[in-house]
Amino acid sequence: MRITAIRGGRGRGKRVNVFLDGKFAFSLEAEVAVREGLQVDQELSASQTEALARSDHFHRCLNAAVYYLSYRPRSESEIRERLQRRGFNGDSIEAVIAKLKEQGLVDDMAFAQFWKDNRQSFSPRSRWLTRLELRQKGVADDIIDQVVDAVDDADSAYRAALSKARSLPLSDYQSFRRRLGDYLKRRGFGYEVINQTIGRMWQEESR
């Protein structure tokens, strides 16, 4: 089979259409076509065509993963599940994840640290709830243990309560206690920590 034309595809994607023996045969990422050195009048065997298809699939899978990572760091499990939903095959997905690991773009330890730090800075919650969230992201328990064990529930509950307490009326202690307690419970804190935090906040806010 001989390449008789290589034409730019329609739309915003950087793809090219390859024609063999005068007929449209397949499309490729333009980057793949350049890297493989495709030229008009070049002869392609069936095995070469299949190899090009595999390379194109991998490249599209890689681009999808990098785009997904552009919003925030992701766990390995999140990336794998996302690519599976996009319909990429298992071989390409595993090859892409391996490449991203080599480049330092996928690292579950770094991701878990990011997640914990982000939560503690902007939306403090309990060690238990942080652990649950990371487990839902597919992070391994041994990594979770290393990262989450440093979370101090008493400190996190106090910081979580600071902004909430200021929005609560101080004329009714029972209402203050109930509303702040419910708020901290939703953040995953236990009974003892909640009671201690409510007592501390009531003293500070009602001075």
Question: Can you say where each PLM-predicted feature lies in the sequence?
Answer:
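An alpha-helical, amphipathic repeat domain used for nucleic-acid recognition
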Residues: 1-207
